[in-house]
Amino acid sequence: VREMLPDVGEPLMLTLNKNVTCSRHKDGRNASDVSYIAFFGEYEGGELVVEEESGDRVLSERRVWHRFKGRDHFHYNLPHSGGTKYSIVAYSQNGNARRAAESAAHKDVC
């Protein structure tokens, strides 16, 4: 994973999600502004919308890594239907105490 995503930063964190839909948020506790997400499964919808200065960017292609700035830009998922949706998110995070706070915060948005 490190070779595929060299600009994520340290420590490299991976989160596996199943059927997760997140509300609008920023990943404020990430150590780096760079995050990646990859989608897997057979489903409809479920796109990740990233609010960038140039306009909204919609990420949906499956089985590829999508690079986005999760710390700097608001982002959220659209609802999905018709099957199981998996995603893997790669990012770096600041410290153990913040890791616990991040996990708790994401329970409120995802």
Q: What kind of region is each of these model predictions?
A:
Residues 1-45:
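Conserved double-stranded beta-helix
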Residues 42-45, 49-110:
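Catalytic core of Fe(II)/2-oxoglutarate
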